[in-house]
């Protein structure tokens, strides 16, 4: 994740940016033994995310970059990947997905 930390994207105000790498439609499905059984028809909604950036108005010590949290479904907003925003890549070319939410929407932290 150190590569992710260097991307030109940061949270503002009381918001937190979360990042995950969910399986996408078209990804190969592989069994535990390594057999390819097809391609995903539909992408997945991740259960867990990593805190990528914490806004300056989030109370100090609430969470830190790198903390693991469950995805606060229903409380998130999509954030385009910086490479997509800069016109360098298409969304399907990037596995990392970013979302933002208010810090109070984060249900738990795994530390």
UniProtKB/Swiss-Prot annotation:
On whether Hydrolase is a keyword of this UniProt record, the answer is no
One GO molecular-function entry:
protein folding chaperone
What biological-process terms (Gene Ontology) are attached?
viral capsid assembly
Q: What InterPro entries does the record tag this protein with? A: Chaperonin_GroES (IPR020818), Chaperonin_GroES_sf (IPR037124), GroES-like_sf (IPR011032), Phage_T4_Gp31_GroEL (IPR016416)
Q: What does this protein do?
A: Essential for proper capsid assembly. In absence of Gp31 the major capsid protein (Gp23) assembles into 'lumps'. Acts as a co-chaperonin with the host groEL protein.
The record's subunit annotation is: Homoheptamer. Forms a stable complex with groEL in the presence of ATP.
Q: What is this protein called?
A: Capsid assembly protein Gp31
Q: Which gene encodes it?
A: 31
């Amino acid at each position: 994740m150190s590569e992710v930390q260097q991307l030109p994207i940061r949270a503002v105000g009381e918001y937190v940016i979360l990042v995950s790498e969910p399986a996408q439609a078209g990804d190969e499905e592989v069994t535990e033994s390594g057999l390819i059984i097809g391609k995903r028809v539909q992408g997945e909604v991740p259960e867990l995310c990593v805190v990528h950036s914490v806004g300056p108005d989030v109370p100090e010590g609430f969470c830190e970059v790198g903390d693991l949290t469950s995805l606060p479904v229903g409380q998130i907003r999509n954030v385009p990947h910086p490479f997509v925003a800069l016109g360098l890549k298409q969304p399907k070319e990037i596995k990392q997905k970013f979302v933002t939410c208010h810090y109070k929407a984060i249900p738990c932290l795994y530390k």
